[in-house]
């Protein structure tokens, strides 16, 4: 749902995302050049043009890749974080990455699994998730509360989202909240400049990090949504 400007428009910009500052420049330019003064109509026109020129940077990136035949997933967590090279670790990372790719190509696909990296402080767990996201703007570790009405803003434009603080302070109640949150396949909300709320299928997946081995409280119903992998960076 984010609007991007991907071509030069005559003034310096820090990113491709359309910002309020960009809108001010555009409104001033259109008024001085063409005498257009209706902000509402200009925003409507921008929305129509954006809708007719949709693109998906993550899909475009993934489609541009060519596999060279080298096995990587099995040894990835060992290489970066010293995790064991075994079938469990391999299947855990493969499942997580398949979920991320599926959500990118088929938004709203059911995927309620969280890969949880467990190891000492400074092990590089957060950095690993950031690297998996490929680009900094596709990663976020800013998700602090799940009961915030504006939590959807923390998901917009991101592909891999780390829950670190929530996992660090998890208790039985908060774990149930996280499990319920992971089970959602979409959010329903209205974005700025729109009048009506709409379904927004999820295009992201969630990773967890913890320094403690016992970060999951005892749950008789099971904690199947959380897949912990021990990491040993000293190895």
Give the label of every model feature segment.
Residues 175-198:
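Conserved catalytic/switch belt of AAA+ P-loop NTPases
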Residues 216-235:
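A short helix-turn-beta junction within AAA+ P-loop NTPase domains corresponding to the substrate/partner-engaging
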Residues 150-157, 191-209:
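AAA+/SF3 P-loop NTPase mechanochemical coupling elements
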Residues 46-156, 160:
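P-loop NTPase catalytic core of nucleic-acid-dependent motor ATPases
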Residues 159-182, 216-222:
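Conserved AAA+/SF3 P-loop NTPase catalytic/coupling segment centered on the Walker-B
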Residues 157-159, 184-185, 202-205, 221-227:
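Short glycine-/polar-rich loops that comprise or flank the Walker A/P-loop
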Residues 126, 164, 178, 207, ...:
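Conserved RecA-like P-loop NTPase ATPase core
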